[in-house]
Amino acid sequence: MSRKKMGLLVMAYGTPYKEEDIERYYTHIRRGRKPEPEMLQDLKDRYEAIGGISPLAQITEQQAHNLEQHLNEIQDEITFKAYIGLKHIEPFIEDAVAEMHKDGITEAVSIVLAPHFSTFSVQSYNKRAKEEAEKLGGLTITSVESWYDEPKFVTYWVDRVKETYASMPEDERENAMLIVSAHSLPEKIKEFGDPYPDQLHESAKLIAEGAGVSEYAVGWQSEGNTPDPWLGPDVQDLTRDLFEQKGYQAFVYVPVGFVADHLEVLYDNDYECKVVTDDIGASYYRPEMPNAKPEFIDALATVVLKKLGR
């Protein structure tokens, strides 16, 4: 039986490939407005603090490659071909769709490397992909909208949290707080009934219950530099408040809204949150990110096949 050929569009935020890319990358995020010199320097300093340009670009490539390979191994009806489409740097989402079209792909499935749906992120990625496909004609894209509740994905984090708690000294384990977080978005998304905040709360509940952790809280991180109010509480403020209320000896951070080691995790968690835990005299823990680990790739493959009714 011959296999059907299908495009696998893997979308992500994107990251600079080298230091010279930082300004144009930041300008794209700011919708064509160049950043002020001090804003640009601040971003460069953050990258410098994590040891240079974030590994995200390489990790995204590995995730897409491994997902293609795994999908082609676990079923025999479809041959998937992966294409990477990024929001803020090349290859842009439109570039990936054009590449699929050029390769004669007529059907594709898309997945965003962000587990929770929001109008601000996932919906805009899928919209860009579908608009480009319609413009070119002859290409239909089926889009995954969210996958935070995929049992295999939840299990990935449950296992990491259990390992982290098992590694703690007993006195810390009995006095630890789990903080589950995602990228903050402007508060106005709530006016449109955006499910994003509820999905993060559901994620936190699934992970905490699965790991047998009763002391947990939900926080937001990495908010943008705009005058609008953003979803809170911020993880750093939350850490201080929880410490003042209960005097926790250890904080465990699970940035479940992210799937890879990049600036938001390596700087906003591993540096900024650790500054807070050091200041209050508590221990800092942050389990390993999914990156391209086999159990995470298997979770994504399961999500894709379920979306296609297989």
Curated annotation (Swiss-Prot):
InterPro entries associated with the record: Ferrochelatase (IPR001015), Ferrochelatase_AS (IPR019772), Ferrochelatase_C (IPR033644), Ferrochelatase_N (IPR033659)
Positions with a binding annotation for Mg(2+): 20, 46, 268, 272
GO molecular function term, any single one: ferrochelatase activity
Entry binding sites for Fe(2+): 183, 264
Entries under Gene3D superfamilies matching the protein: 3.40.50.1400
GO cellular component, one term: cytoplasm
Primary location recorded for the protein, binned into one broad class: cytoplasm
Localization, UniProt: Cytoplasm
Catalytic activity: Fe-coproporphyrin III + 2 H(+) = coproporphyrin III + Fe(2+)
Record note on disruption phenotype: Deletion mutant requires hemin for growth.
Description of pH dependence: Optimum pH is 7.2 with Zn(2+) and protoporphyrin IX as substrates.
Keyword annotations of the record: Cytoplasm, Heme biosynthesis, Iron, Lyase, Magnesium, Metal-binding, Porphyrin biosynthesis
Functional description taken from the UniProt entry: Involved in coproporphyrin-dependent heme b biosynthesis. Catalyzes the insertion of ferrous iron into coproporphyrin III to form Fe-coproporphyrin III. It can also insert iron into protoporphyrin IX. Has weaker activity with 2,4 disulfonate, deuteroporphyrin and 2,4 hydroxyethyl. In vitro, can also use Zn(2+) or Cu(2+).
Entry protein name: Coproporphyrin III ferrochelatase
Gene name for this UniProt entry: cpfC
